[in-house]
């Protein structure tokens, strides 16, 4: 036989998460798990939630069987995890006023600040037993840079690539799960796996009319620098050797203010206005 749900989630911790940036794990399982245990853990602050078990349109069924009302009672302001649920129907938004997955994205505290989660993956149908566990395994592998030649920093990228692994290993059964597994939240969200750190950047505050390049020294590789105006992206570049070089062909033709955002994995973004 295969692994039980509890054993499988322990495997995700032991094989992937424990060797990455995560420093603790709480497995809340039957028969001793409870809603209060789950809510206490989430309110204290967790980065990722893996759920594997029975579920329904309005909640989980095992371990910490939270429901829609419980999610709306969470107080984890500024400590929002992302969630991978293997279970039946938590994303069945089309037949319910508010599905379980929707509740995680809509929850707020008494002041209206977001609680719940930044993203929740849940199926709109009843899931089969084995195929989605292959997908969840791959998502955790990709998340922790353990899947050979496959690194993704976006919530949607991790999920889609995990589903492709499931499709390859499970064939038609995997493809059926992919068709109904739904991302609630922004798939382009760049996730964090650790407490974000500050970093420094050196750059000019002024862009001259006719200037061809804009150079930003960030001291790290893979840092994204983006320039925009009125919500329109004008130029962007990733740093190589700690330096990002941006083409100003669409930027320096006329004077005015330009918004700049500098972002990188597990860091606090730098935002500035250039003139």
For the regions a protein language model found, what residue spans apply to each?
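Cysteine-dependent hydrolase recognition
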Residues: 1-274
């Amino acid at each position: 036989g295969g692994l039980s749900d509890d054993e499988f989630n322990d495997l995700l911790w032991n094989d992937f998460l424990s060797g990455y940036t995560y420093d603790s794990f709480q497995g809340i399982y039957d028969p001793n798990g409870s809603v209060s245990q789950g809510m206490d853990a989430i309110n204290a602050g967790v980065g990722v939630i893996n759920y594997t078990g029975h579920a329904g349109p309005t909640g989980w069924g095992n371990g910490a069987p939270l429901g829609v009302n419980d999610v709306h009672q969470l107080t984890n302001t500024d400590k929002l995890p992302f969630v991978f649920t293997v279970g039946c129907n938590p994303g069945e938004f089309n037949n319910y006023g508010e599905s379980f997955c929707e509740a995680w994205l809509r929850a707020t505290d008494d002041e209206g600040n977001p609680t719940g989660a930044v993203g929740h993956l849940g199926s709109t149908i009843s899931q089969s037993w084995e195929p989605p566990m292959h997908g969840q395994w791959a998502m955790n592998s990709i998340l922790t840079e353990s899947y050979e030649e496959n690194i993704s920093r976006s919530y949607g990228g991790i999920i889609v690539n995990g589903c492709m692994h499931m499709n390859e290993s499970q064939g038609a059964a995997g493809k059926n799960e992919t068709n109904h597994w739904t991302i609630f939240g922004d798939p382009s969200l760049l996730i964090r796996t650790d407490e974000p750190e500050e970093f420094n950047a050196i750059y000019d505050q002024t862009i001259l009319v006719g200037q061809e390049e804009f150079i930003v020294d960030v001291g790290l590789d893979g840092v994204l620098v983006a320039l925009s105006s009125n919500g329109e992206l004008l130029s962007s570049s990733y740093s190589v050797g700690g330096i990002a070089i941006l083409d100003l062909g669409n930027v320096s033709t006329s004077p005015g203010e330009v918004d700049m955002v500098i972002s990188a994995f597990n860091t606090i973004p730098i935002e500035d206005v250039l003139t």
